[in-house]
């Protein structure tokens, strides 16, 4: 059964900032990157445990996928049959709060 995908407000803001940064130089590349990121995230609705456990958090329900150059951190809410995208940030940056 597919999980429902939701986006935390912080993750939505992250996307907006990432798109703005890329689109500043190339709007088409910005749209292309966001589309490919959404495509990668969509797979989590069917395979929520496909991402690795985030080493910094060591919590089996907090996982991540890498969509270069970004880390997409998400939480599996099994009781609610839901995957919440918590944050999206450039992998070279420090860890933001969830």
Mark where each language-model region is.
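Enriched for short, Lys/Arg-rich terminal
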Residues: 67-98
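Short proline/glycine- and basic residue-enriched helix-capping loop/turn segments at helix->loop/beta transitions
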Residues: 45
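Residue-level signal for beta-strand positions within conserved beta-sheet cores that form or flank
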Residues: 1, 60-61, 81-84
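Basic/aromatic recognition patch in beta-strand/loop cores that engages polyanionic ligands
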Residues: 49-79
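Arg/Lys-rich, positively charged N-terminal/basic patches that mediate binding to nucleic acids
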Residues: 1-34
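Residue-level signal for pocket-adjacent positions within structured domains
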Residues: 48-52, 90-93
């Amino acid at each position: 059964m597919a999980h429902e995908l939701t986006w935390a407000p912080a993750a939505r803001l992250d996307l907006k900032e990432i798109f703005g940064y890329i689109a500043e130089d190339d709007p088409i590349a910005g749209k292309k990157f966001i589309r490919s990121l959404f495509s990668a995230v969509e797979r989590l609705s069917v395979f929520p445990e496909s991402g690795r456990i985030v080493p910094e958090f060591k919590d089996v329900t907090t996982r991540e996928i890498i969509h270069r150059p970004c880390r997409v951190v998400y939480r599996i809410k099994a009781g609610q049959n839901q995957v919440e995208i918590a944050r999206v940030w450039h992998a070279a940056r420090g860890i933001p709060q969830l």
